[in-house]
Amino acid sequence: MKKGSKREAGGPQAEQPEPLFSGEDRSLSDGNIVDESDSEESQYSGLEDSGSDSTEDEEEHSSEEIQQNPGKSPKEIRKVPHRPSKSEANSAAAEEDKPSAAKEYENDSSDEEDIRNTVGNIPMEWYQDFPHIGYDLDGRKIFKPLRSKDQLEQFLDKMENPDYWRTVHDKKTGQDVRLTDEQVDLVERLQRGQFGDINYDPYQPSIDFFTHETMIHPVTNRPADKRSFIPSLIEKEKVSKLVHAIKMGWIQPRKPRDDSPAYYDLWAKEDPNAILGRHKMHVPAPKLPLPGHEQSYNPPPEYLMSEEERLAWEQQDPEDRKVPFLPQRFPCLRAVPGYARFIHERFERCLDLYLCPRQRKMRVNVDPEDLIPKLPKPRDLQPFPTVQSLIYRGHKDLVRCISVAPSGQWLVSGSDDCTVRFWEVGTGRCMKSVLLEGAVKSISWNPNPGLVLVAACVEHSVVLINPGLGDRLLCGATDQHIGGYQPPEEEGQQPVSWGEAEGTEYSNGLRLCIKHQKAVKQVTWHARGDYFAVVLPDNGNSQVLIHQLSRRRSQNPFRKNKGQVQKVLFHPTRPFFFVATQRCVRVYNLLKQELSKKLLTNCKWVSSIAVHPAGDNLICGSYDSKLAWFDMDLSTKPYKVLRHHKKALRAVSYHKQYPLFASGSDDGSVIVCHGMVYNDLLQNPLIVPVKVLRGHAIHRDLGVLDVIFHPTQPWVFSSGADATIRLYT
């Protein structure tokens, strides 16, 4: 019996079937549970819910027994167990089942009483694409009711059905539900913003439970909870998080509140001695133009209008007239009448003052030093020649031209003393001197390292000289190359005559002599050393001639020369030919036989030109002391014009390996500049003057006549009118 009572008192074990008792002994088992509820085992079993249930059952049975036996006390009834018969037990069980079934839904407050299916409170959107709306208790599908009404049937139903307006569709059952009057009334009240319950009075009189009178006893005498005087763990965690945030700098203290008034006086800090605020933006009116000569009472005759000009002035509109009045002449100032346009001009002036807007011209104050480009310091651009190292003496007259061998070991110079001298660069020793028939105007060493050959301009001839210096094999190969020429069977007519040197001239080093009809001014070699060009100072069509050494053939590349040719040059890598006239430099394409570019020098008289080893840049010197740098990829106008020299420029030159170029002038100085050309076409060349080299004496108003760089070292040679050649390293 105790085991059965304990199982029935337990919560989860009460649901299991009880084999010890049948349905007939239900009242007996209940009575035993009531009797055993006061035992020690039930008190210390730990099942609080079973104890409460047993006490409730005990009270129900005791009340029933008291009603049946009104003369006995509850203790006596509890002590005497009642063992009913089988028929009484069945009837009692039936009576207990009836009120239990009736009381099942008395206190049920569920909102799902009217649900006719068992799908549960789930979103019906889950089954919108299925033919069923859920499952019943047995796991079978609950199919949706058939809704085969089309729009016409729905419209007829709307017109004919009087309850259509109070019919709604239930999504959970899939059926149309007709709202009752109470439900319609509830909907209308909610639409009006009223409470759903009709009997609810929101304005019922309030009862002030706590009064102003101090009461002796508290309202509630409930003891304080244990958690009220135990530190809270949640607050501890919050405090630890706040401390960590403060340490990490995530929480900053509040900034001190600014108690300054929101409205303050704008002119509180105004200096009383300063200009008033309304005059700070004052724009003064433009002044009236001063009177001119035409407004004089005795103007010059050229300001007086003739009759034709007067008629034309009168026919013009007042807005188109250059002068708003007719100039007049009076014999004296006393004869001048009053000015008739005075009031009109004052009125127009007043209109201009208050109708015409004024604009303040913002003048930018720019520091002049900011306009100067920031150039690197010269010491950061080394190496470049800085000091005079050697002086080559031996010529008796001014040295007009110099040239350096491709190896850089030998130097050749031509002078007005009719000699060509060969010097050793390292020692300054004159290795050989060749006497010619006249003054040497130009000289050039063959750039081909396989040939030892020098071309010099003497009067009407160009002389080719083999100095016999350096490697004997190269000297012999040069003579063999010149002597191996075989004349063609039919010689065409040429503008010049080629002749070979013999006897004493051959022993002095002369090999060929090319005679021209006029004096030769300049000679220059092609980069391969087979072609060389000469310039004849003449206004005719044959100012420029190109000679070929291997075939001993000469030709005139131009039918007509525009302007007087000053200098010519070959492009170092491309088939271009530069021709410098007095004002411009023309670039010709020898393959296409056409003019490629025309560079405008903006100079009065071009004296010399030089081409950068890369071939994209060119410098041009002039007699008006200007040096123009041309970037041929950029423009046909000078990229930069340098005016460093005080007198005429005589020569300019590029270095073949270093970013250097130099210019020599009649002021006796040689200026060396750093000229860096970048491979990036978007970056302009960098030009920085680095050194001014002096040393030449001015003779007959002439200074430095020629400048040339050493082929491999950052050295520069200069020849001057003082009959000397100087080396700067």
Curated annotation (Swiss-Prot):
Annotated region described as Disordered, given as residue ranges: 1-115
Example of a GO biological process term: regulation of cell cycle
GO molecular function: ribonucleoprotein complex binding
Location(s) in or outside the cell: Nucleus, Nucleolus; Nucleus, Nucleoplasm
Primary site of residence: nucleus
Keyword rRNA processing: yes
Ranges for the WD repeats: 394-433, 435-475, 515-557, 560-598, 601-640, 644-683, 699-729
UniProt xrefs under PROSITE patterns: WD_REPEATS_1, WD_REPEATS_2, WD_REPEATS_REGION
Pfam family, one: BOP1NT
Signal peptide span: none
Biased composition (Acidic residues): 50-62
Keywords: Nucleus, Repeat, Ribosome biogenesis, rRNA processing, WD repeat
Basic and acidic residues: compositionally biased ranges: 95-106
Coiled coil: none
Family the UniProt entry places it in: Belongs to the WD repeat BOP1/ERB1 family.
PANTHER family reported in the protein's UniProt record: RIBOSOME BIOGENESIS PROTEIN BOP1, RIBOSOME BIOGENESIS PROTEIN BOP1 BLOCK OF PROLIFERATION 1 PROTEIN
Subunit structure: Component of the PeBoW complex, composed of bop1, pes1 and wdr12. The complex is held together by bop1, which interacts with pes1 via its N-terminal domain and with wdr12 via a high-affinity interaction between the seven-bladed beta-propeller domains of the 2 proteins. The PeBoW complex associates with the 66S pre-ribosome.
Known function: Component of the PeBoW complex, which is required for maturation of 28S and 5.8S ribosomal RNAs and formation of the 60S ribosome.
The protein's name: Ribosome biogenesis protein bop1
